[in-house]
């Protein structure tokens, strides 16, 4: 008996974590709560409840290191501080002008009880619609640096359900169709991953403020248990950092409905405020460009008889833009380096030397004389090392010519991107590696010095850094419209309704809508109706929005093109009236510079009728609804061009019945009576 008592006493003293009380935190309105605890081995975990119901079951925390013992056991927890905040900040541009930042925060110190006695803090920030947490590593004698092989962060989902996810660790970046599977059939997923529980609750797991760190993916380990899977680096360590440092925030948005995920400001709020100061030089706007013709194989990026980027062609597009109140013109293929194997190479690109048949100085001057902004283009072939050697000169040239926005590209082959290593050599790297995270931020910071905004294609994923760097205006990061030009297959009709609740939870998306001629090189062409192409300007958000078709197709259809002329790209408010992931969505947005509202509704491959209550309009005010809807015989397969354009008077008390064809949509401009309107 004495031996048993002695053994129990020794066990209690050897396991101090057993006596630790869980630490808890609630959101401002007590919607969400988080609990942090340790088990008998001193392993720390967190869990999340919503109105007392489990959302995330106990999920482990910690790190696996390449040059030191892993940090995951013999830990004790301590409350290292709490704080709350409730403030409102203004976006210089965006899908909504004012954003409330209201949260409660808990800092948990995780300290080893023996051995190296290292300490890593985990900071939990709890909003009513989501939770963010990150590791903060202080400088300490036994932890001067960290070589991270993997995070041991887990997300154990509390219910069965289904998930929408993009496969991780594929060579073609994010340009894949989303999988829709039961949670238990997810493999390796990129984030954001969207989940709908059987109870109807919606979740999105992602990250915020990805700076000098590898992007996080998710690996399903078993059942509903997921663990973080960092993107590999150019050495055995996926992340190398000196202390002190912080990781990106790990985020979980939580909402009753799919639309609540899109309406959440969690990702933006977790990023640092604007570091650039006055950014009045960042100008949202629409643009046309020498682009779609190349995807249709009518013209080429490289030199020759079919070269698209000629002086004459650029000036023709500038004339069109000036006549139709389009702010910018993009010209791709203007610079030397497109001939030969540029795909995944990029070493031959010059960012200052135009082809002989493109007079850059003349085109820029002509655009300025017409009140049109030239949109620059830097395709890198994912050769980040080569681009960094020239980008300063490239931005300086563009700045001198009055270019305010540059579209960058990182098209690569299966070998990935090329980056400079600390050893002075060029290495291949994943697009979302720590090296590429550093590269993209270097591009954005360099561009800012020249008052240039960046629209990144084939990008690293968006994690809300546009708040900190407002010149990072948009990214592609999805299977965009070009796949409808040549894809085998193209994008299916449900694609855009999926993107709203998956990719668009990251931030602005340059999808390039506005195709008016649906026949392409792809077997199904563009699988939408004409009305849906118009609706995409409201449904899909980007502050730099392209009217992507050939201008001949716009000249042949002036009445529907008027909606593209009228629709703004900078908003005061944005709301999802209804929607289900991959099925349909109705979005309304208020123009930042007038009293007008805009509505966009889209459907998948099924026709449907949606109700749209106009309660978002100002009470007591009349509006003229300019409606662009599918005709009675519209169908994306057999009659995509059947469109009806009509108008009626409405008020906030009205409810509209929106009839959407298969693959269809509806776009509406609500012009306020007595408002100043727009041009």
Where are these regions (language model features)?
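C-terminal beta-strand-rich structural cap/linker in extracellular carbohydrate-active enzymes
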Residues: 647-679
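Aromatic- and carboxylate-enriched substrate-binding clefts and catalytic-loop regions
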Residues: 333-518, 529
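An acidic-aromatic substrate-binding cleft motif
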Residues: 242-324, 328
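N-terminal accessory beta-strand-rich subdomains and adjacent acidic, glycine-rich linkers
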Residues: 21-277
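N-terminal signal peptide c-region/cleavage motif recognized by signal peptidases
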Residues: 14-15
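Edge strands and adjacent loops of beta-rich recognition modules
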Residues: 89-102, 561-587
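Carbohydrate-binding surface patches
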Residues: 581-623, 666-667
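Catalytic cores of secreted or luminal carbohydrate-active enzymes
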Residues: 531-577
